[in-house]
Amino acid sequence: HGKFRRQRQMCIRDSYSIASSPDYEPGTVHLTVGIVRYNHHDRDKTGLCTGFLADRCQVEETDIGVFMSPTRSFVLPSDGSVDAIMVGPGTGIAPFRAFLQQRDINGDTGRNWLFFGDWTEEGEYYYRDEMESWKERGLLDKHDLAWSRQGSEKVYVQHLMKKNGEEIWKWIDGGGYFYVCGDKNYMAKDVHTTLIEICAEFGSMTPDEAKDFVETKLMKTEKRYLRDVY
């Protein structure tokens, strides 16, 4: 029974968006994992998979089974000259790091705009050095940051979208892609609502027309609004 339990504990399976391009650093896969830790009825709890990766995996000493599941529905534009707006707060930044690496390797000329955020700049600015380097080089044309626990005002990515609504509309109206990755319960819904509001205001549409434009034309017909939410 003890052996069976031990084996069961090792059969942990979870899915993560890959945070690296296979062409950028061949032979490696990078993940962006948020450790789940919380207190329940005065007992400290840790997520099975994230706790295993954080607390029990010894670097270069632990073998982990990896199963790749390629997606054909959350990919870069086939035309490298197309602009891309990426909204990925928290660990939602993962695929966009991979996207930017790939666009860098490809020499794509399309503009890149990243909306990122988390609690604080000091504690959760993931891949800061890379992002700032890409911004300096011009690979990352625009980089908007939202910190929800820094200062007196809570700022989220959808607030920065509203602030940049007119320019977002210009990118989309010009054929740009719009990507969202991360929390589906709150963030993705708020971003979706904000995108519809932006299209209504700056695309001269009624609320119903904007909703149809986003949910039918962008998402289903042209597939320029792509989501990886969890």
Q: Which residue ranges define each predicted feature?
A:
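Gly/Ser/Thr-rich beta-alpha loop segments that engage phosphate groups in nucleotides
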Residues: F4, G90, A94, W119, ...
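Active-site beta-strand/loop microenvironment that shapes enzyme catalytic pockets
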Residues: G80-R103
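Reductase modules of NAD(P)H-dependent flavoproteins
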Residues: E25-P26, H30, I35-V75, D104, ...
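Single conserved hydrophobic/aromatic residue that forms the stacking wall/gate
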Residues: H1-R8, I12
